[in-house]
A protein has these predicted regions:
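Eukaryotic intrinsically disordered, low-complexity regulatory linkers and tails enriched in Ser/Thr/Pro
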Residues: 1-479
Length: 479
């Protein structure tokens, strides 16, 4: 239960936030006095004759002024007022519940190591957003939680640079984003120190995993690979081979013994053996179904979710393309064709996971797009439904959490836009035919590529000329 100081003369006097609030609600459905309560996944607005439940995932923004609380939702605006001091309490409680839902969508686990409040600015592909936000540091990520749909999860394995400058904390991601935090006060140094500690632990975890994959890897080679592909990321196989041959050989051996064994030679032929990316992680624990069965006995698991676990991806049947072998690792390959027009993404997940190759159009430079693919795979935990669901399907109520994740992960939005098709692993001949059909039907012209690669000034919105460092209209530095 959250408690707030009432501001009376006695600082020890506190009043508990009520479970149910009373206020005047105005919305497209009704306008009247309501009882207001917050459940795990939604807010309940109960009038005398009308009843409205709004899922937190439907909320676009939460805005508090001195006299009213405004919720912008997918279906319209909701205004709550006539609550006095309790309006602030409702806002705090709603904001906290909203954030917990977002963190669940991000699949964040474990306890927050640090939580603070400040302001942030994020620059993503020429777009700018920011404002006040809660900031939480976890074992493997930093989460930005504003009171709107612009939340971001920043995996530490994709962090390229972190520096304290002019009382701000500036981050640069390998996937291109630049994020700065300000108005942190004394907690700025604490955040910097905690981030450094987490990065050190990530480096140690990476080295331990490398030794497990390739016991004969040297210390120098391990240090190079750790910088190239921290735990959770993939990297260009050619670079791995040049600097750590033993580690590259270990990955190659794992692929040849995995469910990708039969498709591996053809994928190498597709790219000419050049420029493809690989990644490797330990396989997840196989007790998730058992845990969910226990939850079902306790009444804590929806039947629809259990059905999904038992029947997931039935249409992607596995036969001669993928040998049935026990999965000890998770492997993935990102393979461009020689002309860099399309990319094939091949996964080797758990032994019960159905198999298919996903094809994407390459919108710009291959290396930049490969990083975006890698970022999307990490964010979605290799969930291919996030890519193949149509916009209409994504808007269905049962896909609300997926829609929230896509909206808050630019890399997933990009992959969905560039998705060109898939080749199901039913037979080698069928698989090859599907791949070739996707390749033949997928061709981005030079003008289309230029349009995709267009960048605009984050200040005035003017189109930036290729290669320039400053906007020709307002002089803002290009990012």
């Amino acid at each position: 239960m959250i408690s707030f100081d009432m501001g009376s003369g006695n600082s020890n006097v506190q009043e508990k936030v009520p479970e149910t609030f009373q206020g005047y609600v105005e919305c497209p459905v009704f306008s009247e006095d309501c009882s207001i309560s917050l459940e795990k996944n939604h807010i309940v607005l109960a009038g005398r004759f009308r009843h409205l439940e709004v899922m937190y995932g439907e909320i676009i923004t939460i805005h508090l002024t001195a006299y009213q609380l405004t919720l912008m939702t997918d279906s319209g605006q909701i205004t709550i007022s006539r609550m006095g001091q309790k309006l602030q309490w409702l806002y705090q409680k709603l904001y906290a519940a909203f954030n917990e839902t977002v963190l669940e969508v991000f699949k964040v686990t474990g306890k927050a190591l640090l939580e603070l409040t400040g302001e942030y600015t994020a620059k993503e592909e020429g777009m700018l957003h920011g404002g006040p936000a809660r900031i939480r540091l976890y074992e493997d990520c930093l989460c930005i939680l504003p009171p709107n749909e612009n939340a971001r999860r920043l995996p530490l394995c994709f962090l390229k640079d972190a520096v304290v400058r002019n009382y701000t904390y500036e981050l640069q991601m390998h996937s291109g984003e630049r994020i700065s935090f300000s108005k942190l006060g004394r907690e700025l140094d604490i955040l910097d120190r905690q981030m450094t500690e987490r990065l050190h632990k990530l480096g140690k975890k990476t080295l331990e995993w490398q030794k497990e994959v390739a016991p004969d890897i040297s210390s120098m080679q391990a240090a190079y690979v750790a910088g190239l592909m921290p735990y959770g990321r993939g990297a260009q196989f050619q670079k791995i081979t040049e600097m750590a041959p033993s580690f590259a050989a270990a990955i190659d051996k794992q692929i040849k013994e995995s469910r990708m064994a039969n498709t591996y030679p053809w994928l190498l032929e597709l790219c000419g053996g050049q420029d493809f990316w690989t990644g490797i992680l330990p396989a997840p624990k196989q007790d998730s179904l058992l845990e969910n069965m226990e939850c079902l006995q306790d009444g804590n698991l929806e039947l629809s979710k259990l059905s999904g676990l038992l029947n997931a991806n039935k249409d992607e049947s596995t036969s001669e393309v993928m040998p049935e072998k026990k999965a000890e690792t998770v492997l993935w390959m990102l393979v461009p064709d020689k002309a860099k027009r399309i990319a094939a993404v091949e996964l080797s997940l758990t032994e019960n996971e159905a198999a298919a190759t996903y094809i994407y159009r390459i919108p710009g430079a291959w290396e930049d797009f490969a990083i975006q693919i890698d970022r999307a795979l990490e964010a979605g935990e290799f969930d291919r439904q996030l890519i193949q669901l149509s916009e209409e399907q994504l808007r269905l109520p049962e896909n609300l959490e997926k829609r929230m994740l896509v909206k808050r992960t630019p890399a997933l939005e990009l992959l969905r836009k560039q998705f060109a098709g898939r080749a199901i692993h039913t037979s080698m001949d069928r698989w090859k035919k599907d791949i070739e059909t996707c390749c033949n039907n997928t061709c981005i012209t030079s003008s289309e590529k230029e349009k995709v690669m267009e960048k605009h000034c984050v200040t005035c919105g003017a189109k930036l000329q290729a290669g320039v460092k400053f906007c020709g209209q307002c002089g803002t530095r290009a990012i």
